[in-house]
Curated annotation (Swiss-Prot):
Disulfide bonds join C50-C69, C65-C112, C86-C117, C107-C126. Its main location: secreted. This is Evasin-4. The keyword Disulfide bond applies. Glycans are attached at N54, N64, N70, N77, N83, N106, N114. Keywords: Disulfide bond, Glycoprotein, Secreted, Signal. Changing F52A: No effect on binding to CCL5.
Length: 127
């Protein structure tokens, strides 16, 4: 009878050892652990602001057809495509109005052609 208990005891120990090797969770080492300190780079999705002149004909690019833009991390110039509307000239009689925010002034509108604002001019109100 003692032999039966010894046999059952040995079988239980063997089963326990077998289960502990098959079911153990592998421990992470420093080389296999994910780097929780690293942050994702979301700058590509950051809000982008570009600065145009507003007019009765729509938004106008600057005379050099290179629009100043910025995101939360960087400033850059974005070249306007050919035939985009651009600010050709400003009426010098209303130049003082430009210094006052949201005051309309007379301006001439052209179109971008290889990085420069070209005519024929169209007249508009700008602000």
């Amino acid at each position: 009878m003692a032999f039966k208990y010894w046999f059952v005891f040995a079988a239980v120990l063997y089963a326990r050892q077998w289960l502990s090797t098959k079911c153990e969770v592998p421990q992470m080492t420093s080389s296999s652990a994910p780097d929780l300190e690293e942050e994702d780079d979301y700058t590509a999705y950051a809000p982008l602001t570009c600065y145009f002149t507003n007019s009765t004909l729509g938004l106008l690019a600057p005379p050099n057809c290179s629009v100043l833009c910025n995101s939360t991390t960087t400033w850059f110039n974005e070249t306007s495509p050919n035939n985009a509307s651009c600010l050709l000239t400003v009426d010098f009689l209303t130049q003082d109005a430009i210094l006052q925010e949201n005051q309309p002034y007379n301006c001439s509108v052209g179109h971008c052609d290889n990085g420069t604002c070209a005519g024929p001019p169209r007249h508009a109100q700008c602000w």
